[in-house]
Amino acid sequence: MPYQTVNGIKIYYEEQGRGEPLLLINGLAFPMDLWFAQIEELSKDFRVIALDNRGIGRSDKPDEVYSMELMASDAVGLLRSLGIQKANVAGLSMGGFISQEIALSCPEMVNRLILVATGMGGPRSLALGKPFWDRMAAAIAGKKPWEIYRIDLTLMTAPGFVEQHPDTLDKAVELRMENPQPLHAFVRQYTAAGLFDSNERVQKIDQPTLIVLGREDPIFPIALAEDFREKMPHATMIIYEQCGHAILLEKPDRLSKDIRDFLKS
């Protein structure tokens, strides 16, 4: 199994395809496996590298303080260990936070930036997302991991999605159950994500940027689109209708196409 030791821990990754490097960074409590549709499709044109962040999947899960800066350093260290000096970087949700941090801390390593179902953190974002987390906390109390994974995907996707796509739900739960996330690791990731705030820094990102948002995302509600428009006016923004937070699962083909078109434009 492919690992690289970065910042003193083992980071699991997979790569597929040839061409310009494309790094895929997933979100809170999501292993890299959930990029399965994008890996399969985008590896036809790019060298796709997907990693498990610290605290999830097959990467190490130290019970210590995490931060977006540290997780960005993990991703950058992985790229450097693979001999990659510059890559396109795509991040979903918390992975979007990490991707922003990479673009800000190591701009010379980022060719183009893709931010999916994410925001800039900070008090406004936390307040808008709080109803989702309150619902989640009430719904998962006392539940087993496989039940939690079904519940969170049901709550974060657009209404009716899991009923219409039961096979997608089953596959996502199965992939997550291969390496269930320990509670301490979830708390470490969640806490780190809650402290992220790029609102006063994001204007410094000058790489070509694609922002993809779901109209019905309960974690990063669509009101945050205006924040992006104000602070990243030169970014390309696409809003998916009838789509919630798990865009990589809800609109897999369209997401792959939009990423490909953006990178080839």
Where would I find each of the regions flagged by the language model?
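Short beta-strand/loop motif that positions the catalytic acidic residue
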Residues: 205, 211-213, 217
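Conserved HGGG/HGGXW glycine-rich cap/lid loop of the alpha/beta-hydrolase fold
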Residues: 7-64
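Conserved alpha/beta-hydrolase catalytic His-Asp/Glu region
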Residues: 146-201
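Gly/Ala-rich beta-loop-alpha elbow adjacent to hydrolase catalytic centers
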Residues: 91, 95, 99
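Catalytic active-site module of serine/aspartate enzymes centered on a nucleophile-bearing elbow/loop
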Residues: 235-265
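Flexible "cap/lid" loop of the alpha/beta hydrolase fold
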Residues: 104, 111-142
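Conserved alpha/beta-hydrolase "acid-adjacent" motif
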Residues: 218-224
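Active-site loop/oxyanion-hole signature of alpha/beta-hydrolase fold enzymes
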Residues: 50-90
